[in-house]
UniProtKB/Swiss-Prot annotation:
Annotated MPN domain residues: 53-190
UniProt subunit comment: Component of the CSN complex, probably composed of cops1, cops2, cops3, cops4, cops5, cops6, cops7, cops8 and cops9.
UniProt keyword terms in alphabetical order: Cytoplasm, Cytoplasmic vesicle, Hydrolase, Metal-binding, Metalloprotease, Nucleus, Protease, Signalosome, Synapse, Zinc
Binding site for Zn(2+): H136, H138, D149
Family as reported in the entry's similarity comment: Belongs to the peptidase M67A family. CSN5 subfamily.
SUPFAM superfamilies to which the protein is assigned, alphabetical: JAB1/MPN domain
EC number: 3.4.-.-
Taxonomic source organism: Danio rerio
KW Nucleotide-binding (keyword) present: no
Entry protein name: COP9 signalosome complex subunit 5
Function: Probable protease subunit of the COP9 signalosome complex (CSN), a complex involved in various cellular and developmental processes. The CSN complex is an essential regulator of the ubiquitin (Ubl) conjugation pathway by mediating the deneddylation of the cullin subunits of E3 ligase complexes, leading to modify the Ubl ligase activity. In the complex, it probably acts as the catalytic center that mediates the cleavage of nedd8 from cullins. It however has no metalloprotease activity by itself and requires the other subunits of the CSN complex.
């Protein structure tokens, strides 16, 4: 159990988990206040109104476990929570019985019935929070919204405001050790957002870049943080024991073997593209813009290469440590 506690503490530190001191404030549900916010609808006056998203450690762990259970298939779930000013607070989450593929999730009638029954039963046991968003996984290709995701989120924001979309990459979570997660809200149709600075760089596979580029200006990311309290510590410990055993008994080198191979192939294609563009650029004089674009692609490919290498080394180090802990036989006595 000591090892489990250390692993849990490491996970909390890796994801910058904050312990809430004023427990009653964040866990108390003020129905009147929430109704006043819903009536005022401040997000209709400012399309960039919500800026922050807070997730409870319990909701986060449930989402990560669900996403990991799907493997290479996308999974989907719903989140319960409330609004506090410009912050969307996610208190809990639950999985939905949906059909998933490697590129999308499809919610059928049974999923909507399950959703309604779950929320109703949650209220009967004192969980008064409403549905505040949905989550789904992007196994191996990062946290962003595809064209289908943008359409789904736009529809949700049209009829179920306030609503947020959360994307988790379980494959990169296993590789990096830190939860790879993003929270997003879409802009209304026809709205042109102001030019923003460059967002944090993330590796996008070559076959997804077009989908990413076409829709990247139709939504924005919220600043994500995580919190916990002594109230949910016991539940978190019980849930962690299952998560920790799965993590300890698995190897990212084996679990993510296909992902790593795909990363290497994707990287080789990006390098070939960059090399071809640089080659063409050498025959064209005075086209500095073309050269800069080629060099930019080469720089991104270099960053992707470093990331893949670090993740592979991280997985190898984990295997060596586990081998030393569990498989080494003391031969000095022989």
């Amino acid at each position: 159990m000591a090892g489990s506690s250390i692993a849990m503490k490491t996970w909390e530190l890796s994801n910058s988990m904050q312990e809430v001191q004023s427990i009653d404030e964040i866990y108390k549900y003020d129905k009147k206040q929430q109704q006043e916010i819903l009536a005022a609808k401040p997000w209709t006056k400012d399309h960039h109104y919500f800026k922050y998203c807070k997730l409870s450690a319990l909701a986060l762990l449930k989402m990560v476990m669900h996403a990991r259970s799907g493997g290479n298939l996308e999974v989907m779930g719903l989140m319960l929570g409330k609004v506090d000013g410009e912050t969307m607070i996610i208190m809990d989450s639950f999985a939905l019985p949906v059909e998933g593929t490697e590129t999308r999730v499809n919610a059928q009638a049974a999923a909507y019935e399950y959703m309604a029954a779950y929320i109703e039963n949650a209220k009967q046991v004192g969980r008064l929070e409403n549905a505040i968003g949905w989550y789904h996984s992007h196994p191996g290709y990062g946290c962003w919204l595809s064209g289908i995701d943008v359409s789904t989120q736009m529809l949700n924001q049209q009829f179920q405001e306030p609503f947020v979309a959360v994307v988790i990459d379980p494959t990169r979570t296993i590789s990096a050790g830190k939860v790879n997660l993003g929270a997003f809200r879409t802009y209304p149709k026809g709205y042109k957002p102001p030019d923003e600075g460059p967002s944090e760089y993330q590796t996008i596979p070559l076959n997804k870049i077009e989908d990413f580029g076409v829709h990247c200006k139709q939504y924005y990311a919220l600043e994500v943080s995580y919190f916990k309290s002594s109230l949910d510590r016991k539940l978190l410990e019980l849930l962690w024991n299952k998560y920790w055993v799965n993590t300890l008994s698995s190897s990212s080198l084996l679990t993510n073997a296909d992902y790593t191979t795909g990363q290497v192939f994707d990287l080789s294609e990006k390098l070939e593209q960059a090399e071809a563009q640089l080659g063409r650029g050498s025959f064209m004089l005075g086209l500095d813009t073309h050269d800069r674009k080629s060099e930019d692609k080469l720089a991104k490919a270099t960053r992707d290469s470093c990331k893949t290498t670090i993740e592979a080394i991280h997985g190898l180090m984990s295997q060596v440590i586990k081998d030393k802990l569990f498989n080494q036989v003391n031969t000095s006595a022989n």
